[in-house]
């Protein structure tokens, strides 16, 4: 019997066995690496195509996917009970971070985060104090102040309006900052205010938004700022139809009605989502509270080709100076506090 063929065969079989053993040993590690990062996002009422708050969040998630090649799971709720259900299911399916868009998701985040302590949660526009939750909030009153200034600077009647969505402290922040900005320019100006409702349905009623806007226009307002989600689409359409001006909210809505949208109070929701996903992927994500204002580029007013003719160089200069003064602390914008 030839010794060398036998040795060669033995070596081959041993090598194969070692290879199989190594594969079996490393497979779980490789699988774990492949599953190491699985981001997810749960939108609030209105859905990711609301052309406002949720859409801005969606854009942040999509940008992350484009930049990194990492896909994300998402869920659009249609009723309140789905918040908790969706988050729990995403956590069970291996999500490593779940971004909850909107203050109404706070209770669901608090409950599910306790059930899944190893999953990271980021909530936008609310505070949940847990060791695995990051809370991102904005100083909406600062951008609203600038929008109020712009409204007062272009108003011919000295009367402007505000239409909010759900009557909650967050929307009162917008209203108060806006009013202070108006009064900063024209102390004698009138500011009409209406809230759409007291339930989440107030975010998705453009017909009601249009009705409220028409009422304010009828009282003499010639500029209306909305902070009402999809309801605000009706406000903006009513302004265009009446030959008046509107101010968008959350995302840059200038493009919706070029020449009719004075500006938009933009909020870095897309930035917040992108940052949450990116930090979690990089291992730099931290729980706790994060506040974003003008100084952090978290909020601002929008200026582009769609409203360039409405915001004159003189108006822009005044807004730029006010922005610098707010950042420097020379102008104090009141933050609404619930009584």
How would you label these PLM feature ranges?
Residues 9, 13-27:
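Bacterial N-terminal signal peptides
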Residues 33-339:
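A residue-level marker of the well-folded mature domains of exported/periplasmic proteins
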